[in-house]
């Protein structure tokens, strides 16, 4: 391609001899541009043969150094660069060259002017002291050297050195940028572990404000703490005494008896309970289905009747004794077989009495002149115990004439 361009230029010079100067200038610029592009591709790492071809293509398509950042894969394919590795290397080197050109333009645009202080001192150097200060400043400051513009030849020679310097400057700029970012970022506080800090002190709300009271109520509802005592649920300050008193709960104590009577009753009840053969009231008209009772030391009921005649008193006493109450059902076992007992054996030997007195018993309310008086001696068996004399007196008062068989009950076989 380069030889064709040269032949075309020579052919044009022969045809137009008046334009030789212009052709020479264009040829010099083309050759310089081609050499620059060849050096560019060599620095990018492309072999010499493809580098010359790429340089000629860039010159033919009038690619300038200021267009390096506009290059991309599609444009490189249109220019004839199809190797992927060459495309990547050219694009990377294009960025580096663009940075170098920008740095050169920045350094050339800022000239090194002398300090304005020295000019002012020189202008106002009227006295000896001012002249001495100005001379000392001139001796201390280095002489100002004018900047020289680098030629194309020197730039070609120092391309590799400038590339290295540009890489170093880019690294330095990156480090400076990182340092600035680190300065901007706020410093993180060092974490303090629980062992270094110590135990936490948590102050719970005391319920002085409505909000804290509400929070405490919610916590208690969440925990589900239920009061286990009735007194806690009722709000009592102290529990009442649930133990019963040691006072006696007898009938006389509940009726308001005197302490002396209570002591007597307690002593009688102790004596009665100590005896093993205490008889209980079983009722006159009930069936006698149990065995014979034991004779008691102290009978539960003693009845003395006084009548007008001595015969009546001797007759009523054994009958009432024979009708004494049976003993407790749990104190003795029932016999296996009960013998048949006749009525006369159960009644015992009867005294010589009148027939009227054997067959009937008169009440105190009757019209007869005989008066029957009962002297009752009770023993306190228990709260459930009932007096047999009361039932007997009631029966004798209200019932007119009661036979012995009715009072003895039915016969047991």
Curated annotation (Swiss-Prot):
InterPro entries recorded for this chain?
C19orf47-like, C19orf47_SAM, DUF5577, SAM/pointed_sf
Give the sites of the cross-link named Glycyl lysine isopeptide (Lys-Gly) (interchain with G-Cter in SUMO2): 239
Q: Out of the domains of life, which is the source?
A: Eukaryota
Q: Does the keyword Ubl conjugation apply?
A: yes
User: Which residues get modified to Phosphoserine?
Assistant: 115, 141, 269, 296, 342
The residue ranges flagged as biased composition, category Polar residues, are 127-139
> Where is composition skewed (Low complexity) in this entry?
302-318
Residue segments, region Disordered: 108-158, 232-257, 290-336
Q: What UniProt keywords are attached to this protein's entry?
A: Isopeptide bond, Phosphoprotein, Ubl conjugation
Gene3D superfamilies tied to this protein: Transcription Factor, Ets-1
Name of the protein in its database record: Uncharacterized protein C19orf47 homolog
| Organism of provenance | Mus musculus
**What lineage does UniProt assign to this protein's organism?**
Eukaryota, Metazoa, Chordata, Craniata, Vertebrata
């Amino acid at each position: 391609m380069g030889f064709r361009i040269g032949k075309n230029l020579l052919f044009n010079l022969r045809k137009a001899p008046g334009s030789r100067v212009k052709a020479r200038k264009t040829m010099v610029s083309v050759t310089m541009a081609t050499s620059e592009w060849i050096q560019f591709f060599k620095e990018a790492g492309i072999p010499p043969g493809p580098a010359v071809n790429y340089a000629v293509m860039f010159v033919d398509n009038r690619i300038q150094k200021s267009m390096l950042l506009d290059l991309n894969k599609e444009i490189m394919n249109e220019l004839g660069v199809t190797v992927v590795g060459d495309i990547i290397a050219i694009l990377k080197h294009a960025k580096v060259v663009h940075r170098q050109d920008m740095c050169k333009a920045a350094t050339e645009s800022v000239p090194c002017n002398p300090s304005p202080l020295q000019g002012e001192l020189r202008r106002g150097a009227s006295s000896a002291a001012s002249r001495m200060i100005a001379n000392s400043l001139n001796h201390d400051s280095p002489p100002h050297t004018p900047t020289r513009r680098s030629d194309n030849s020197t730039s070609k020679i120092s391309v590799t050195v400038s590339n290295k310097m540009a890489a170093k400057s880019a690294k330095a700029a990156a480090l400076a940028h990182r340092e600035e970012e680190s300065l901007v970022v706020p410093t993180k506080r060092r974490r303090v572990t629980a062992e270094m800090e110590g135990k936490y002190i948590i102050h719970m709300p005391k319920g002085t404000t409505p909000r804290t009271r509400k929070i405490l109520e919610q916590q208690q509802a969440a925990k589900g703490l239920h009061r286990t005592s009735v007194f806690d649920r009722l709000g009592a300050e102290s529990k009442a005494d649930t133990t019963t008193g040691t006072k006696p709960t007898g009938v006389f104590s509940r009726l308001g008896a005197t302490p002396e009577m209570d002591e007597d009753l307690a002593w009688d009840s102790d004596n009665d309970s100590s005896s093993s053969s205490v008889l209980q009231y079983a009722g006159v008209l009930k069936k006698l289905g149990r065995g014979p009772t034991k004779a008691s030391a102290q009978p539960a009921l003693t009845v003395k009747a006084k009548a007008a005649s001595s015969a009546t008193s001797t007759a009523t006493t054994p009958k009432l004794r024979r009708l004494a109450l049976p003993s407790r059902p749990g104190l003795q076992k029932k016999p296996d077989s009960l013998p048949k007992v006749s009525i006369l054996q159960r009644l015992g030997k009867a005294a010589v009495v009148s027939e009227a007195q054997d067959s009937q018993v008169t009440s105190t309310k009757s019209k007869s002149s005989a008066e029957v008086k009962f002297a009752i001696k009770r023993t306190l068996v228990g709260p459930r115990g009932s007096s047999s004399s009361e039932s007997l007196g009631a029966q004798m008062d209200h019932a007119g004439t009661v036979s012995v068989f009715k009072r003895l009950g039915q016969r047991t076989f």
